[in-house]
Design a protein with these regions (language model features):
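Alpha-helical subdomain
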Residues: 1-143
Length: 143
């Protein structure tokens, strides 16, 4: 039996993603899983990002983890330029408080929601003047 599945669904629809029958054939939804939202929430407005992350968390078994990373620019002018240049999709420069809110109801691991490069074993940044990635790991409370 294959242990992988490709899911063709809208990321913004957690029920469609996690309810996909091909996925359920390889992942038991009653057991802890890890959902990784790497470098995607900055394409969702803050309200939608909260709804989407909460949707995934609501469908995850206790002990599951949500891993999330989000690009963040301190320089608002640079962020605006990036948003204007990025024409394939709308890009949002979420505030650190927005990003922390995506973990509401979860137990934060490690250093919490912080710059990804500050996590253990992260390679040193070549140039961090323009922006960075905020990241965190949250665990669904329970067993």
């Amino acid at each position: 039996m294959p242990r992988t599945a490709a899911v063709d669904a809208d990321l913004r629809d957690p029920a469609a993603v996690l309810g996909n029958q091909d996925l359920r054939a390889v992942i038991d939804p009653g057991r802890p899983v890890c959902v990784i939202l790497g470098a995607v929430v900055h394409f969702l407005d803050p309200q939608a990002a909260c709804v989407v992350t909460a949707g995934y968390v609501s469908l995850m078994a206790p002990g599951s983890c949500l891993v999330l990373s989000c690009a963040r620019f301190e320089d608002e002018e640079l962020a605006k330029q990036l948003a204007e240049e990025y024409t394939a999709a709308t890009w949002y420069n979420h505030s650190p408080a927005d990003i922390v809110s995506f973990f509401d109801g979860l137990e934060l691991a490690g250093p919490g929601v912080t710059e990804a490069r500050t996590w253990p074993k992260w390679p040193p940044a070549a140039d961090d003047r323009n922006g960075h990635v905020l990241a965190g790991v949250g665990r669904v409370p329970g067993t």
